[in-house]
């Protein structure tokens, strides 16, 4: 299925304002519900009512989700022995982004949803791993998280409206790099170089793909997968590579080959202007974004989350144990 006819475009493409509004509305609704839940529990217990926990803001929730996308990238690299394709990370990161548009980290703990998203992504990207193989790459509490993943997979699919096929920017970037190297060789007659000197075309392709894919991995911390098409995402990454390696002549390639720019064609001039504006928007977003480079950032928010998370979904809480016991009694009655 092409992107232009996909659910990704029709169901999961937003403006920055729409994303901000959805997150604010979701956060406000959860805060109201958890606050009411807390007061009701305090009234039942009676006596002195302890202070209500501090709840996370929408902005703080975004930081936590960003933190777990970074953690997911680190975990993804642990699967090198399984040969997971890069699309798996793109699928999983997009799932997590979509899920937390309409759901809160205060309800559904991000570590659990991150693992579930990664496991589901393996299947959706046509590279299924057995649960034992998957769990073997989880650093700790493997049995606990295996159970969580099994019980959360269908729930995640439902929350994603079963839109689990993702068009990622990896393949478009690959195609652009192939065209770039062909353009340099046939049109410009330039040697294949990257600063250090002449490099074989295949080696250069491998090097640029690796570098470009790492940029894509990093940029999944932003909302690019929700605000722009995969091809625009990929083109922005190519331009980023061009800034890192000026000798590649990326801008000339984009203008002359990708866009086939002709200044005498008014329609072409308009398209070129529109594309430049799109790329400038992305570059501004990337330039202003605060990327995570290690997991120490946001650890204070994680501590707040542990205090304010919904006890009904916390396996260690009394409320969760009571709800589980009630569900088991109901199931035994049905048997």
Curated annotation (Swiss-Prot):
One of its GO terms (cellular component) is nucleus. GO terms for biological process: regulation of transcription by RNA polymerase II. Coiled coil: none annotated. Belongs to the cyclin family. Cyclin C subfamily. Its main location: nucleus. Regulates CDK7, the catalytic subunit of the CDK-activating kinase (CAK) enzymatic complex. This is Probable cyclin-H. Keywords: Cell cycle, Cyclin, Nucleus. It comes from Echinococcus multilocularis. The keyword Cell cycle applies.
């Amino acid at each position: 299925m092409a992107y232009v006819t996909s659910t990704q475009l029709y169901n999961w493409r937003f403006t920055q304002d729409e994303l901000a509004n959805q997150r604010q509305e979701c956060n406000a609704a959860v805060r109201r519900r958890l606050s009411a839940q807390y007061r009701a529990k305090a009234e039942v217990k009676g006596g002195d009512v302890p202070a209500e926990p501090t709840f996370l803001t929408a902005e703080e929730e975004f930081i936590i989700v960003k933190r777990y996308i970074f953690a997911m990238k680190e975990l993804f690299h642990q699967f090198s022995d399984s040969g997971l394709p890069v699309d798996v990370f793109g699928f999983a990161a997009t799932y997590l982004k979509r899920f937390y548009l309409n759901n809160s980290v205060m309800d559904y703990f991000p570590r659990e949803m991150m693992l579930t998203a990664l496991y589901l992504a393996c299947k959706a990207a046509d590279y299924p791993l057995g649960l034992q193989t998957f769990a073997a790459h989880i650093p700790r509490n493997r049995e606990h998280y295996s159970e969580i993943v099994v019980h959360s997979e269908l729930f995640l699919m439902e929350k994603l409206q079963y839109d689990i096929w993702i068009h990622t920017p990896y393949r478009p970037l690959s195609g652009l790099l192939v065209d770039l190297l062909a353009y340099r060789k046939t049109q410009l007659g330039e040697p294949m170089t990257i600063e250090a000197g002449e490099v074989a075309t295949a080696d250069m392709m491998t090097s640029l793909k690796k570098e470009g894919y790492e940029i894509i991995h990093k940029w999944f911390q932003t909302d690019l997968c929700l605000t722009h098409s995969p091809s625009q995402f990929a083109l922005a990454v190519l331009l980023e590579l061009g800034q890192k390696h000026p000798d590649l002549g990326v801008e000339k390639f984009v203008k002359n080959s990708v866009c086939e720019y002709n200044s005498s064609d008014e329609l072409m001039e308009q398209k070129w202007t529109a594309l430049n504006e799109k790329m400038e928007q992305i570059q501004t977003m990337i330039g202003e974004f605060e990327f995570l480079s290690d997991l120490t950032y946001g650890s204070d928010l994680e501590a707040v989350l542990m205090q304010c998370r919904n006890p009904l979904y916390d396996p260690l809480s009394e409320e969760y144990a009571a709800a589980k016991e009630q569900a088991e009694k109901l199931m035994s009655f049905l048997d």
